Amino acid sequence: MYWESAMKKSAAFTLIEILVTISIIALLTMIGVTNFRVANQKARDGRRQGDLEQIKAALELYRTDQGKYPIGASLPATIESATTVYMNEVPDDPVAAQTYYFSSDGETYTLCAGLELGTDIVNGCGSCGVTCNYKVTSPL
């Protein structure tokens, strides 16, 4: 008789065991979601930096052929001359609310982006939709 009642008690989980288990699962889930969010931000920042380097390469090719950079206060849809296409489609920021800032007087240019994980504010940039904190300029 005693043996049967002891078996019945140990066959179930106590309320404390269930609460501890749920708490551990919740904590691990929160850590996983936070790490996933940061990984996505890093990926978008890497894409922004890569995009600006690609635009820079196209602008340098344009200058080599044309003797100057394209003049303007915004990025054109394509970077091309009358005879050569240097970049078929200028990439957009991965976040729709943000843009890449571009300014050129023909002799120099400035490209800027707002990194999600960057904290330094860069001077000489216009509006990226957020605070610009990554800058690429023409070689001097």
Language model segments and positions:
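Short, surface-exposed interaction loops/tails
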Residues: 106-140
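N-terminal single-pass transmembrane signal-anchor helix
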Residues: 8-36
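Regular, well-ordered alpha-helical segments
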Residues: 30, 38-41, 57, 61-64
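Extracellular/periplasmic head regions of type IV pilus-like filament subunits
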Residues: 57-117
